[in-house]
Amino acid sequence: MLYLYLGLSILSALLLSPRPVLIPLVFLGALLALALLHVLVLAVASLFVDRQQPDPKGFPFYRKLIAASVGPFLQLGRVRIDLVGAEKLPEGGFLLVGNHRSDFDPVTAMYALRGRGLTFVTKKENTTIPVAGRIILGSGCLSLDRSDDRQGLMVIRQVVRRIRNGEAIGIYPEGTRSKTGQLLPFRMGCFKAAQWAKCPLAVLKTEDSELVGRNFLRRPTTVRLTVKAVLPYEQIADMDTAEIGEMVRRILTT
């Protein structure tokens, strides 16, 4: 409602402006006002998320907030998302894994697959970012302390429970973004989540997301997200995690 009111006010100001030369200034001021209003909405919404004990399932409201933030950000930066193969994704819960090339990867995938309510396991450091960290937790993303194996096991168990309840959860097996574009060694334990949840394993390949920051505002960028394969549970049920990891690696590099 606030956005609608401000939008109508801006439209009125543009239409009634006695000096056409002022219209660009009014427009730029309007964009700034909308941006500040959106930041205020995010800041207020973040206050309702307990960083120490967030709701393990998250809330659709916060996922919509992320989508409402990422969409304009991509448009402003002249970034286009090319999603290929989404029709392969199964109904119900599944584990999504893929390569990790940029800090933008999780939110880009969440935005592209926003109709599926996708959330991610994210490193603990991301959840300590002012305002954004609480929004991330509020959306249902799970905080992982990479230095604590016991906490990591607890997170995997949470992933399993949520997938069994029909959710789509994403994990980057590399554990961190690759600065060279080449796949890093996998942390094989994450594949256990698909075996324990008895769910399909979807493989998502991300291309050119590392160019977003480099090209932002300067030139158009197309980020390609390709669902390369969906491995049914029956195919991975009796494999060890190293075998699953090698299969995923082959899929991502072909």
Model-based region annotation:
Residues 1-10, 18-93:
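Membrane-anchoring hydrophobic helices of lipid-metabolizing enzymes
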Residues 20, 153-254:
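Non-catalytic C-terminal accessory region of glycerolipid acyltransferases
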Residues 46-67, 75-76, 90-148:
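Catalytic core of membrane glycerolipid acyltransferases/transacylases, capturing the structured
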Residues 83, 142-145, 233:
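Short acidic-hydrophobic, aromatic-tinged amphipathic segments that line or gate anion-handling sites
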Residues 83, 96, 120-121, 225-227:
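Generic preference for hydrophobic
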Residues 83-86, 129, 153-156:
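Structural motif corresponding to alpha-helix initiation and N-cap regions
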Residues 87, 149, 207:
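Residue-level "edge-of-site" marker
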